[in-house]
Structure formats: C-alpha cells, structure tokens
Amino acid sequence: YMRQLLKKYKQRDRERQEQLTSDPLHPVQLPISDEVYILQKYRWLILSNQSNIRYHSDLRMDQHFHVLMNTYDYEDWLFRIDSNLKDFRDLKEQYVLFNSRNGGNPIAARTEIDELIVAYKKSSYEMFRDFANLLEKYKDPIINSFIMVKKVGNGKIYDSRLSNGP
C-alpha cells in the first residue's frame, strides 16, 4: 500500500512537471513534493513496531520543510497524506501486541487469536480481511508457536518459542 501511495504521488509530480515544461530542451525541475519526501523518508513510522520507535519531542530543523519538527510531526504528516495509514498502523499493532502478550501462553493465544480474526474480518480493508483468513487457516500452527521450550545455545539454557519450521 505504501509503495502504491508513493507511486501515485510521484506520478502526480511527473505530470505536474510535464505540464510546466513548455520547452523539452529546458525541462522545469520541481523540488520533491512534501508527500513524496514524507513517504520516502518517514514511512518507517508506519512500518516499524511502535514499541521500537523512539519518539523525540525535541524539535530539529527539517531541511525539506525548513521548520522545526519532531517525530510526532512526521507521523502527523503521514496521517494527513492518507488517513488510512493510521488505521493500517493500528490494525498491524494489534497483531504485534497479540504476539508479544502471548509468548509462553498458548491458551491465552487461542482465545485472543479468535478475537483478532473477528476484528480483522470486520475491517473495511481487504488486506486485513485476507490476513484474517490466513490467521484462521493457520491458527493451530500459530498457537503452537507460543509454546516455550528450553534450548541450549552458547553454553546457556534459555526459553524459546517452539518453531513450526524444519
């Protein structure tokens, strides 16, 4: 979705540049648009897990906008470009939290995955409805992945989630 959004704004910018260029030998060079700049440089604010993002409230000069901005400002810009991005991020975070809350507790994971499937199926976004179908199809292997086992590595014994792979 992010790539499609970026392509849409790049195409818009190319068309705008072509409209302004009257002489093909001297094309008009437009600066990068605000939307393309934000989507290229700060899409990680949507794609990263929120728990991994260090939000800075201290202001720093942004070279593109020529104003003082912080992480919250960039996030706000992303949401203004496309309000769906906030919903996507929030729905993604539900799955991230499901994973982090249920490590070592497959019984709780079984209950919570059903709630997650219902929430995703009710979503107005096709990608999350499709993901709900995947969760439903692979529910048992997903639940089994929350079983913790003792493993040995680097001379130490530690707990690790059971792998469904080879």
Enumerate the predicted regions with their spans.
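Catalytic center-proximal scaffold of phosphoryl-transfer enzymes
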Residues: 1-150, 163
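Short, conserved catalytic/metal-binding micro-motifs enriched in Asp/Glu and His
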Residues: 154-166
